[in-house]
């Protein structure tokens, strides 16, 4: 079973990541289907597209766009699946909706996506805990590598370009290569900002 242009994937776990384990208790974090931040982004690849060359293989773990597994309310107020739904627990995902795939225990980006971790705000008078639009590149891609922008570099990115993901207990911002505006180089005195709630959740 293969799609011509899309991946066929199944979610790892539930469609929504609404709970977090606190000791022996499952804490419910969200009860609304509208909140995209709690949609599960992790999937297993069931099949790869026939007409698109991709490094992703059947069985790989991938990170997806938040709308693949999401549910919506239609005009009549009824819950419906996203247009990505195929059947049972299977979904279509276009190449543009697959951001990362895991290979040899490491995450590799697909196409022009990259992931940046925000840095701590050291200004004692500031109310924000992280510096706006500045972060450390954690997962790069081939486009950025050609520009000599590599993981570990401190970068400035466009305001509003960041989409929040939780990858391996780290809160990262997903964006495109052209959202990276400036490379500062590696800065040893800059500390990553990863809130405690990001650990142990997706």
Where are these regions (language model features)?
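Acidic-enriched and Gly/Ser
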Residues: 1-202
């Amino acid at each position: 079973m293969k799609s011509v242009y899309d991946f066929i994937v199944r979610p790892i776990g539930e469609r929504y990541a609404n709970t977090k384990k606190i000791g022996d208790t499952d804490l419910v974090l969200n009860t609304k289907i509208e909140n995209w931040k709690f949609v599960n982004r992790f999937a297993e690849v069931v099949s790869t597209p026939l007409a698109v060359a991709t490094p992703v293989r059947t069985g790989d773990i991938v990170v997806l766009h938040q709308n693949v597994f999401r549910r919506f309310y239609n005009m009549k107020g009824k819950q419906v699946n996203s247009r990505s739904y195929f059947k049972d627990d299977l979904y279509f995902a276009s190449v543009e909706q697959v951001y990362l795939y895991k290979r040899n225990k490491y995450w590799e980006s697909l196409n022009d996506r990259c992931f940046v971790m925000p840095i701590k705000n050291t200004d004692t008078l500031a109310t924000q805990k992280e510096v706006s639009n500045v972060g450390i590149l954690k997962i790069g891609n081939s486009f950025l590598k050609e520009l000599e922008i590599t993981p570990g570099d401190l970068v400035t990115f466009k305001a509003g370009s960041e989409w929040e993901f939780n990858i391996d207990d780290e809160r990262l911002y997903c964006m495109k290569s052209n959202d990276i505006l400036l490379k500062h180089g590696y800065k040893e005195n800059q500390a990553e900002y990863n809130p405690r709630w990001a650990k142990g959740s997706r």
